[in-house]
Swiss-Prot record:
Record text on subunit structure and interactions: The Tat system comprises two distinct complexes: a TatABC complex, containing multiple copies of TatA, TatB and TatC subunits, and a separate TatA complex, containing only TatA subunits. Substrates initially bind to the TatABC complex, which probably triggers association of the separate TatA complex to form the active translocon.
Membrane topology (UniProt): Single-pass membrane protein
Ranges of Basic and acidic residues composition bias in the record: 83-92
Chain segments carrying region Disordered: 43-92
Keywords, ordered alphabetically: Cell inner membrane, Cell membrane, Membrane, Protein transport, Translocation, Transmembrane, Transmembrane helix, Transport
Gene: tatA
Similarity comment: Belongs to the TatA/E family.
Classification of source organism: Bacteria, Pseudomonadati, Pseudomonadota, Gammaproteobacteria, Pseudomonadales
Cellular localisation: Cell inner membrane
HAMAP family tied to this protein: TatA_E
Keyword Cytoplasm set for record: no
Origin: domain of life: Bacteria
PANTHER family, per the entry: SEC-INDEPENDENT PROTEIN TRANSLOCASE PROTEIN TATA
Organism: Pseudomonas fluorescens (strain Pf0-1)
Stated name of the protein: Sec-independent protein translocase protein TatA
Cellular-component GO terms for this entry: TAT protein transport complex
Length: 92
């Protein structure tokens, strides 16, 4: 039997129709139907390949490492931190 009997569902349906009205329920049903149709169309579009004429990428041969360490030696910057004074506030 369950929690709701068929009589309970009839009462709930009557209350919903009285509260929202048949016109709003019809519009709501139409909107939900269009949303489901759009969702199904989008799902079908995703399953199709985007561009069947695209060829697979050719494998790139591995690049031999050059002597880049000699061409670009690391630069070391040697500085000391200096204390900066707070600016004087004009509103005080």
């Amino acid at each position: 039997m369950g929690i709701f009997d068929w009589k309970h569902w009839i009462v709930i349906l009557v209350v919903v129709v009285l509260v929202f009205g048949t016109k709003k329920l019809k519009n709501l049903g139409t909107d939900v139907g269009e949303s489901i149709k759009g969702f199904r169309k989008a799902m079908n579009d995703d399953e199709k390949p985007a561009d069947p004429t695209v060829t697979p990428a050719q494998p790139v041969p591995p690049v031999q490492p050059q002597a880049t360490a000699q061409a670009n030696p690391p630069h070391t910057i040697d500085v000391q931190a200096q204390k900066v004074e707070e600016p004087i506030r004009k509103d005080v």
